[in-house]
Amino acid sequence: MVNLNIALIAHDMKKSLMIDFAIAYKDILEKCNIYATGATGQLVEEATGIKVNKFLPGPMGGDQQIGAMIAEDKMDLVIFLRDPLTAQPHEPDILALLRVCDVHSIPLATNLATAEVLIKGLDAGLLEWRNAVK
């Protein structure tokens, strides 16, 4: 788990869940380079003490900034806790982010269950292949 870059994104209704996730898996996350959209990054940093590289808020282009890192092969894993029950004004940006993860084979979790599987896989060394393809 050397220098892997992880993006954390959470819609407003999922921010508290992201904080709980980050606290629960702090020992794993602090071994990685963490990137996040604006408010999510600030909340995670305050709750855990982990340094978070913060982008713009999602609706202001933060999702696209993370997408650019993915397209440049500079992001290894994305945890995006989406709120599927609330319409998002920047839905095209969200879909573009999901698409770029698929195009570049970047592991992506959009709910807590998948996020936990990915973070435990990361801890078990199952994402070391990302270092080999960089």
From Swiss-Prot:
What is the gene called? mgsA
Q: Where is the MGS-like domain?
A: 1-134
Q: What class of enzyme is it?
A: lyase
Q: Which reaction does it catalyse?
A: dihydroxyacetone phosphate = methylglyoxal + phosphate
CDD domains tied to this protein: MGS
Q: What is the protein name for this chain?
A: Methylglyoxal synthase
This chain's source organism reads Thermoanaerobacterium thermosaccharolyticum (Clostridium thermosaccharolyticum)
Q: Which terms under GO biological process does the entry name?
A: methylglyoxal biosynthetic process
A molecular function GO annotation:
methylglyoxal synthase activity
